[in-house]
Amino acid sequence: MLALKISVYSVVFFFLGIFVFGFLASDPSRTPSRKDLED
């Protein structure tokens, strides 16, 4: 039962991380101030 809970949480955090990463990756294109930090 513990393994099932761990696998479910890992999948949820995996998709959540992809969503957050995709949101932050598309953010600099809209905000010029974010591009200054990358340089």
Curated annotation (Swiss-Prot):
Oligomeric form and interacting partners: PSII is composed of 1 copy each of membrane proteins PsbA, PsbB, PsbC, PsbD, PsbE, PsbF, PsbH, PsbI, PsbJ, PsbK, PsbL, PsbM, PsbT, PsbX, PsbY, PsbZ, Psb30/Ycf12, peripheral proteins PsbO, CyanoQ (PsbQ), PsbU, PsbV and a large number of cofactors. It forms dimeric complexes.
NCBIfam families from the UniProt entry: PRK02655.1
InterPro entries with a match to the protein in the record: PSII_PsbI (IPR003686), PSII_PsbI_sf (IPR037271)
Domain of life: Bacteria
Protein's organism: Synechococcus sp. (strain WH7803)
Homology family: Belongs to the PsbI family.
Function: One of the components of the core complex of photosystem II (PSII), required for its stability and/or assembly. PSII is a light-driven water:plastoquinone oxidoreductase that uses light energy to abstract electrons from H(2)O, generating O(2) and a proton gradient subsequently used for ATP formation. It consists of a core antenna complex that captures photons, and an electron transfer chain that converts photonic excitation into a charge separation.
Location relative to the cell: Cellular thylakoid membrane
GO BP term, example: photosynthesis
Name used for this protein in its record: Photosystem II reaction center protein I
GO cellular component, one term: photosystem II reaction center
Key words of the record: Membrane, Photosynthesis, Photosystem II, Reaction center, Thylakoid, Transmembrane, Transmembrane helix
Membrane association type: Single-pass membrane protein
Pfam families membership: PsbI
Transmembrane annotation, as ranges: 6-26
Main location: membrane
Record lineage: Bacteria, Bacillati, Cyanobacteriota, Cyanophyceae, Synechococcales
